[in-house]
């Protein structure tokens, strides 16, 4: 995996192309089970390189040992183009593989990714989904004081339960 990480860190399209031609294994994972594609998202590789990986067989439906999906990684690293690509190619915006029940909308809310929240809402994401502790995306947005996200979600700042959160 070290060779992959080195190439991805440099966003080296030609290096990836050559490594793949030389027989590189796209199914390699890092210490925490992240795929090459997930590592490319973490390295903030451009869309051309990400598409090269996908067209070469990288699994867009992959997730790591904690259940963090490629969609989650795209949200974390604010890759709007990849979020759109994943949804257009069958990614279920309501599916989570995390044991905690943490969803893509919750991730977008935590990180204040308003543009991604809009995309998820346009694709019928469930705003009412709760994680194992009973928290929803609105709860995460309130906790993190993400006002731009709260403005997009079903949030009533005048509701008494919301008085100690963002206004």
Stretches found by the model and what they are:
Residues 1-38, 42, 51, 55, ...:
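Intrinsically disordered, low-complexity regulatory segments in ankyrin-centric signaling systems
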Residues 1-6, 123, 132-135, 139-167:
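Ankyrin-repeat-protein effector appendages
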Residues 1-4, 29-37, 63-69, 96-103, ...:
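Ankyrin-repeat boundary/"N-cap" motif
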Residues 6-12, 39-46, 73-79, 107-113, ...:
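Ankyrin repeat A-helix N-terminal signature
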Residues 15, 48-49, 81-82, 115-116, ...:
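Conserved ankyrin/ankyrin-like repeat signature
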Residues 18-25, 51-59, 84-92, 118-126, ...:
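Ankyrin repeat domain, specifically the short helix-to-loop turn at the C-terminus of the second helix
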Residues 41-42, 64-90, 94-99:
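Alpha-helical adaptor scaffolds
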Residues 94-139:
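Ankyrin-repeat and related helical/solenoid repeat scaffolds used for protein-protein interactions
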């Amino acid at each position: 995996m070290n060779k992959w990480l080195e190439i991805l860190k440099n966003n080296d399209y030609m290096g990836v192309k050559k490594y793949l031609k030389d027989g590189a294994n796209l199914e390699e994972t890092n210490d925490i089970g992240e795929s090459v594609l997930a590592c490319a998202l973490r390295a903030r590789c451009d869309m051309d390189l990400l598409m090269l990986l996908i067209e070469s067989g990288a699994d867009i439906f992959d997730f790591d040992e904690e259940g963090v999906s490629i969609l989650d990684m795209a949200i974390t690293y604010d890759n709007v183009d990849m979020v759109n690509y994943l949804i257009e190619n069958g990614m279920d915006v309501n599916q989570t593989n995390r044991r905690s029940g943490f969803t893509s909308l919750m991730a977008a809310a935590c990180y204040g990714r308003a543009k991604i929240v809009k995309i998820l809402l346009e694709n019928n994401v469930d705003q009412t989904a709760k994680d194992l502790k009973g928290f929803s995306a609105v709860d995460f947005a309130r906790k993190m004081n993400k006002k731009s996200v709260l403005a997009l979600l079903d949030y009533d700042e005048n509701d008494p339960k919301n008085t100690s959160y963002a206004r």
